[in-house]
Amino acid sequence: MHAFCLPGQESQLATTVAFLRAAMNFYQTHFNSYPFGSYKLVFVEELPTQRSDSATLALVSTDLLHGPDAIDQVYEARLCLSHALACQWMGINMQQKNWSDLWLVNGLGLYMTGLFLCKLFGNNEYRFRLKKDMERVVESDRGAMPPICRPNNPEPPDAAAIPFINLKAPLVLHILDRKLGKSGTSVGLPRVLNKIFLEGVVGDTNLYISTHSFLRICRKVSGVDLRTFADQWIYGSGCPKFGFSAVFNRKKMAVEISMQQECPAYIFHEKNDRSKIIHKPVPFFEVRQLHGFRPQQSY
C-alpha cells in the first residue's frame, strides 16, 4: 500500500492513513485475499467529489487529512478510507450483473466497512451509528421511495434515490445477517461473502453478482428460506412501525404484551393501485409471536 499527498502535508498523511494496514488485514482475514497486486491512495486538492475509486487506486480529497489532535473528523475520514478499500473487493473487482443489483454491490461494500469500524471503534459506536441510520431510513421510507431492487427495470436507479439505497441496503444486509445467524447453523453473512469472493477467484464469469444468485448462495450455505424476506425487504418498499402496550393480568399473574404494526408506505399508496404496482409497499412485515411472562416474586 502507498499513500501520496502534496508537500507539507506529510505529518497529516501519516496520521490519517495509519489504520489502513489494520483494515487490509481485517478484510483479507474475513473476505479472502486482496484481489489486486497493489493499492494506492492519492490525496488531491479541489477534487469535485470526496472520493473517486478505480482498480488499485483511490483519489481522495485533502479535506479528509487531519492531525493527531482531531476528534470528530477521525470517524468521517476512517469511514471514507476504509470504504474505499472495501470497494476494491466489492464494487471494482466484483460488480453488479444488472442495474437492479446496484443495491447489493453498494450495500455489501458498506456492510464490510461497518464490520471493520465495529472492530476499530467498538460495538457501542457501531450500534449507535446503526440506530441513527435506521431512524433516517424510517423517516425516508414512508411511501416516496421505491424498492431498493427493481428486477423488471433495466434503467439505472434515479440519482436522487441512490443515497437512500446506500443508506437502506447495508441495514437490510444487517437484518439478513441476524436472520442467518439465528437459523441454528451459526452461519452469518461474512461466511456467505467469503464463499462469493472465493468463487470469484475461479474466473471472470464469477465476477458479476446478482440479487438472485446472492440469495441462492445464502440459502445454500444456511438452509434458510429467504423468499418472504426478499419480497418484503428487497423487492418491496416501506418499513414497519411497531407500537407496544402492556397490561398486568391479576388473575393469571402475568404481564400481557400487545403489539400493533403499521406500515406507513402501504397506507400512503393504499388507495392508488398504479403506485402500489410501481412501489410495491409491504402491507405487513413478518414478526415473531410475543409471549407473556410471569414477574419475579419479591419478598
Predicted regions span which residues?
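Hydrophobic alpha-helical and helix-loop surface patches within well-folded domains
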Residues: A3-E270
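Intrinsic-disorder/low-complexity coil detector
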Residues: M145, C263, K280-V282, R294
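Short, compositionally biased segments
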Residues: F164-L167, F284-H291
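Short coil-to-beta strand junction motifs in C2/discoidin
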Residues: I267-V287
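Solvent-exposed beta-strand/loop surfaces of large extracellular or lumenal domains
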Residues: L290-Y299
